[in-house]
Curated annotation (Swiss-Prot):
Its EC number is 2.7.7.72, 3.1.3.-, 3.1.4.-. This is Multifunctional CCA protein. Comprises two domains: an N-terminal domain containing the nucleotidyltransferase activity and a C-terminal HD domain associated with both phosphodiesterase and phosphatase activities. GO terms for biological process: RNA repair; tRNA 3'-terminal CCA addition. Mg(2+) binds at D21, D23. Its cofactor is Mg(2+); Ni(2+). It catalyses: a tRNA precursor + 2 CTP + ATP = a tRNA with a 3' CCA end + 3 diphosphate; a tRNA with a 3' CCA end + 2 CTP + ATP = a tRNA with a 3' CCACCA end + 3 diphosphate. CTP binds at G8, R11, R91, R138, R141. Keywords: ATP-binding, Hydrolase, Magnesium, Metal-binding, Multifunctional enzyme, Nickel, Nucleotide-binding, Nucleotidyltransferase, RNA repair, RNA-binding, Transferase, tRNA processing. A single active site specifically recognizes both ATP and CTP and is responsible for their addition. Catalyzes the addition and repair of the essential 3'-terminal CCA sequence in tRNAs without using a nucleic acid template. Adds these three nucleotides in the order of C, C, and A to the tRNA nucleotide-73, using CTP and ATP as substrates and producing inorganic pyrophosphate. tRNA 3'-terminal CCA addition is required both for tRNA processing and repair. Also involved in tRNA surveillance by mediating tandem CCA addition to generate a CCACCA at the 3' terminus of unstable tRNAs. While stable tRNAs receive only 3'-terminal CCA, unstable tRNAs are marked with CCACCA and rapidly degraded.
Length: 412
């Protein structure tokens, strides 16, 4: 029995990057032998074994044979006769198909992973890559993760990804797997690259048609030097990435920014850019996308609010006090003040996603916080003590909040 460190841990070690997870491969052993040594088996389809001391995961070497459509259509062989190279060849990219002997430290690299690391190249190992449609998303995610290091996708790999898209294999992916890869991609160093790659291989129109239709939609040059709405969205995503450490819910912030302009291309030209009324079409599209991918509720809710109200936030200094209070009520900031922070970050990312405005301040956020702090300080108990009852309490609370917002507005 031989044990190897495999996959991302070997790759990241060679790139001098922090190693987050360590995956171990066992060659020349059976499940029974591992169990007899104290390993605990977890999982049925792809058995993984927990080390009796470290609780780290160990997997038996395996071969795979395509038996159907989608990423689940495989027959696996876990026999002790499966070699290290036979296991590694089933992996997606050469840089993920290296193994390190735990005893000697020697690195096995049968497919040129080291060379591709040096050349900053994401390259598939063989045509068997096409057997798993999820790999289209995975490669896009790796491109997003390593873009800042200068990595690009090999032309042959891009061509194969395009063929996989064209043959309909992506239609077999479940919502859960699409969202899982996308959420990981959002938290890479360059999430916009994920969507650029998917668009380049024609997968964006299949997986994210609501996002794809933003590309080619022309914006007013007066307000957007980057006239394509899709490009503006990706610029906004880059800006959100710079702000994400301030977010209470980072995933929600990034997803909201991605969805903030959905449907805007369907608003009449006369209303742009001053369309302060809710974008009903955008709300529908944001709902549709989130529901199809089974996006978590909190993530979906912020995206809906940002899509609906971000233009109001940009013009908050021009809104009357009643509309400011209405905005706060719609955001439910009294019960969820952290949501206001993330909403404002999303609006700031949008405002800065204009060529030449990348490092501009966003005073609207400061004003919104001032309005909120003052309005939130209104004492409900004082209203009750003044004799107001039932619905009159709510009405008076709104009136006092409006008045204090008005005082701040008049003092500006």
């Amino acid at each position: 029995m031989q044990i190897y460190l495999v996959g991302g841990a070997v790759r990241d070690q060679l790139l001098n990057l922090p190693i987050k997870d360590r995956d171990f491969l066992v060659v020349g052993a059976t499940a029974k032998e591992l169990i007899n040594q104290g390993y605990q088996q977890v999982g049925a389809d792809f058995p993984v074994f927990l080390h009796p001391v470290t609780q780290q995961e160990y997997a038996l070497a395996r071969q795979e044979r395509k038996s159907g459509t989608g990423y689940t259509g495989f027959v696996c062989d876990f026999s002790p006769n499966v070699t290290l190279e036979q296991d590694l060849i089933r992996r997606d990219l050469t840089i993920n198909a290296m193994a390190q002997d735990l005893t000697s430290g020697q690195i096995f690299d049968p497919f040129g992973g080291k060379t591709d690391l040096a050349n900053r190249l994401l390259r598939h190992i063989s045509d068997a890559f096409a057997e798993d449609p999820l790999r289209v998303l995975r490669v896009a995610r790796f491109a997003a993760r390593f873009h800042h290091l200068g990595f690009s996708i090999a032309e042959q790999t891009l061509e194969l990804m395009q063929k996989m898209t064209a043959c309909g294999e992506l239609n077999h992916l479940t919502a859960e797997r699409i969202w899982r890869e996308t959420e990981k991609a959002l938290h890479t160093e360059s999430p916009h690259i994920y969507f650029q790659v998917l668009r380049k291989v024609n997968a964006l129109a299949i997986l994210f048609p609501e996002i794809d239709q933003l590309f080619g939609q022309i914006q007013s040059v007066k307000y957007h030097l980057e006239t394509d709405r899709g490009q503006h969205t990706l610029l906004a995503l880059q800006q959100a990435k710079l702000l994400v450490k301030q977010a209470h819910n980072p995933t929600a912030l990034l997803w909201a920014v991605l969805c903030h302009d959905l449907g805007k291309d369907l608003i009449s030209a006369e209303m742009l850019p001053h369309h302060y009324q809710p974008n009903v079409t955008g709300i529908q599209l944001t709902h549709q996308l989130a529901d199809r991918l089974k996006v978590p509720t909190a993530v979906k809710e912020l995206a809906l609010l940002v899509n609906k109200y971000h233009t109001n936030c940009h013009k908050i200094a021009e809104l009357d006090s009643e509309r400011v209070l209405e905005l706060f009520n719609q955001l439910d900031v009294w019960r969820k003040p952290q949501r206001l922070d993330d909403f404002l970050l999303a609006c700031e990312a949008d405002a800065r996603a204009r060529l030449g405005a990348e490092y501009c301040s966003y005073p609207q956020a400061t004003l919104a916080i001032d309005y909120f702090n003052a309005a939130n300080a209104v004492n409900v108990q004082a209203i009750i003590a003044d004799g107001f009852k039932k619905q009159a309490i709510r009405d008076e609370l709104n009136n006092r909040r409006i008045n204090i917002i008005k005082q701040i507005k008049n003092a500006i």
